[in-house]
Amino acid sequence: MTGKEMFEKLGYEKTCHDEREIIYSIYSDNVFIAEIEFDLQNQTFYCAFLDEALEVGMKTLKAINQQCRELGWL
């Protein structure tokens, strides 16, 4: 299963993919809830829940790790 498929299974949708970043976001009733952003230039990622840090569960961590593998970071 790809990182994108794993994120989609968790309810995320890919909202951006360009030369600088990949962003997966979750919305509830069209209201932004959380996002995971991969910075392709700096090979970093961050997780945000509204304006705070996002608690990352093991299924989400597995999706993050899979995406990092696909990007060649791991």
Question: Which role fits each region the language model picked out?
Answer:
Residues M1-Y24:
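Negatively charged, low-complexity tracts enriched in Asp/Glu with abundant Ser/Thr
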Residues C16-L61:
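Acidic, low-complexity, intrinsically disordered interaction modules
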Residues R69-L74:
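Short acidic DE-rich linear segments
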